[in-house]
Every structure is written in structure tokens, then in C-alpha cells.
Amino acid sequence: MAERKYFGTDGVRGLVGQSPITPEFVMKLGWAAGKVLAKQGTKKVIIGKDTRISGYMLESALEAGLAAAGLKAKFTGPMPTPAVAYLTQTFRAEAGIVISASHNPYYDNGIKFFSSEGTKLPDDVEMAIEAELDKPMTCVESALLGKASRLNDAAGRYIEFCKSTFPKELSLAGVKMVVDCAHGATYHIAPNVFKELGAEIITIGCEPNGTNINHEVGATDVRALQAKVLEEKADFGVAFDGDGDRIIMVDDLGNKVDGDQIAYIIARDALRRGELKGGVVGTLMTNMGMEVALRNLGIPFVRSNVGDRYVMEKLLENNWKIGAENSGHVILLDKVTTGDAIVAALQVIASIVGSKMSLKELCNGMTLFPQVLENIRFVGDNNPLDTELVKAAQADVETKLGDNGRVLLRKSGTEPLIRVMVEGENAELVQQYALQIVDAVKESC
């Protein structure tokens, strides 16, 4: 397959105002996508966004491009990414488009697509869009131009769907929880879901202003959530990222509960109910402690490459239903078609309520190995991982760890970062080995 020119592992993403996230390019992207999608069916797309200030500009650019290709667009306004996937299916649209850079800062943004089935676009469709992008932009005749309209009941529809995934025999009455929406797309959705199911909720990160998305709140920074859970003496806390496809939780003692632990709780609960279908998919970043804990329960486990796209591929390949990344992407294919943080939260909470155990107690069956993750920013086209210095440092650490740990070095698919992960049984040695590799990477940048 030809190499992608524009699409990364999660759509098209970058710094707003710089290629490819400019009004001109996004308008042409809308047109190119419209040209490809128009050949497939209803000529209707659902478009959602997170709360970044640039979303308004990019929304208008997309609208112009899609209209020029003859497609109708329905806009949801701020809406979680998984909500757009769900609404794309229920409205029988040809595609869903999300304007978001997920967990990134406000000055980044991106465009990602869903198929009519609410899944990531197939590779051949992405390549077809890329081919159109290299052609001159044209416009259909005036009578065939696309129209745009607002989808006014999008939030209510999605709230009801989320609630439908929570067992009818259970209630959140008596549950006190803190909800952190990262000043992002879940700010008007998640609090209502939990409140309508009976919980007492305290909210943080629910006042978006266009530039505060993911800033010191949300799934990528749970310090505010940890403090609030302790201050309010809450049963637990839930943090989402800017577009609502990542979840991190906090127990009543302020301990962070990551995507690995969340998947473990959900899988173990499904096993207890006799409803587990197959095993669990993790990634190369998944903690070895999860692999060991699942093995102890007799639950199969496999690793995919990093990225929810690859977790999904492994799930479909094995016909399994539960997959996760430790960063908080949790995919539950018996309920949704993509990572959905609110739905994942509800399944963990159902386990808490149904078992009458605390979140901390539910995590006790899994012991996390000490793991150090460092991100090193680099500039230019040269990949530091290709240097002999970095390769030698990695080989040395792997020899020292033997079978009692892992090293993973990778280039981010969405940012100019080198990610260094070292994992092992001894926390002090893991930190020391990670520093050895980080120094080599920095010297090679």
C-alpha cells in the first residue's frame, strides 16, 4: 500500500494555522472526502467537535468543502468522539467527522473520520481521499450543492444511549463521585448521564472557554481529580480527555486507576457473570502486571501495536470484545464500535455497585509492575531511534532486564515525540535504565 501523505494513525492532526490544519487545507479535505463519500450512498455526514476555539473555523471550512462536493452536513456542536460514531450509525449517515486533537493542548486540532458503521475509515477509503487531495478542487453545479443544518437533539440521544449500557437492575443512588471533563466535549454529557442514573456528582473541568481544554485537568492530568476526590470524600473519581474517548479513574484514597486496570476490572466482571467472549487485547505499552493477572484468571491476552486503531484490528481478528490502552482508550465491542470513555466508566461503576466492593478493592487482583514512560520532543526529519547510540543503549538495558522486564521505544504517530518505556520488577533500576536510554535519545536528537 502507498504511504500516507496526510493521514496519521488518528486522522489528520497538527498545530492550528500550520499545514495541514489551515482553513484552506481543511476545506479541500472536506471536498476530497465528499467526492469519495458521494459515490457510496446517502451523501450525508455527521460532524462533531470538541471545545477548542479553532473548532469554529475548521467547522466552517469543512462545511464549505463538503458543500462543494454535494454533501449534506449535520452539525452536533461540541460532542464526544464516540457520540459522533454512534450518531453516524443511528442517522444512517455515510460518514462521521470529528474536529478534535483529543488529549492534545488547545493550539492543536485535527480531523478524523468514521465509516457509516461507526468505525475508523478503511485504509482504501483514506487512500482514495488522499488521491483526491492531490487534484484541483472543483464544485458541483449550484442545484447540487450540499446544505448544512444543526442536529439539535444530539446530546439527548447520546445520553440515553450511554444510560442504556448500564444494567437496569442497578442504580447509582448513594454513590458520590467526582467527574472531570477536561473542559472538553463531555462537559454537558457525562454529568447528566451519571446524575440521571442517581449519583451525587461533583464536577471539575466542566467550564470550557476555548483554550483550557486538557489544561491541568482530565485523563492526562488527574492531580486536580485526586485532590477533589479526597476533599469531597467521594467514592471515586472519573476523568475524561478532551474528546471523551479516554478514561482514567481515581479511587477513594486518591490512587490513579489506568486503562489497563479498567480493562482488567471489566474483563473479570464479565468472566464472573459468564459473559466474557474470548480474551483481552492490550498494546505494547500494556503493563506486564495486567498480562499476569489475566493469565491467573485463565483469560487469554494478546498485544497489538500502540493506538486504538490497532487494538481494534486485533479484536476483530480474534473476534474478542474487550481491548484497552493504559492511556485510557477502552473498547467494548459488545456495546460500542469505538473507544467510549463514558460507557467504559459505566461498566466499572456497575462492577463497583454490583459487587459492593470499592474501586480500590476491585484493583487488588492486579499488581502493576514499576513502569517509567518518558517523552522526548525532537525536531527535523531524522529519527533518533535509528542511531547506533540509541540502539546500543536499548540493547544494554534489555540485557540487564532479561526476562523480568521490557523496553519499548517508539516514535509517536501524532506528535514529534520519541516515547521511551522501561518496565521491570525493581522501581529504582527501572528509573535508572530509563534515564540511560533517555540520555542517548536526547544526545541523538
Swiss-Prot record:
Activated by phosphorylation. It comes from the Bacteria. Binds 1 Mg(2+) ion per subunit. GO terms for cellular component: cytosol. Keywords: Isomerase, Magnesium, Metal-binding, Phosphoprotein. GO terms for biological process: carbohydrate metabolic process; peptidoglycan biosynthetic process; UDP-N-acetylglucosamine biosynthetic process. GO terms for molecular function: magnesium ion binding; phosphoglucosamine mutase activity; phosphomannomutase activity. The modification Phosphoserine is found at S102. Its EC number is 5.4.2.10. The active site is at S102 (phosphoserine intermediate). PANTHER family: PHOSPHOGLUCOMUTASE (ALPHA-D-GLUCOSE-1,6-BISPHOSPHATE-DEPENDENT), PHOSPHOHEXOSE MUTASE. Catalyzes the conversion of glucosamine-6-phosphate to glucosamine-1-phosphate. Belongs to the phosphohexose mutase family. This is Phosphoglucosamine mutase. It comes from Aliivibrio salmonicida (strain LFI1238). The lineage of its organism: Bacteria, Pseudomonadati, Pseudomonadota, Gammaproteobacteria, Vibrionales.
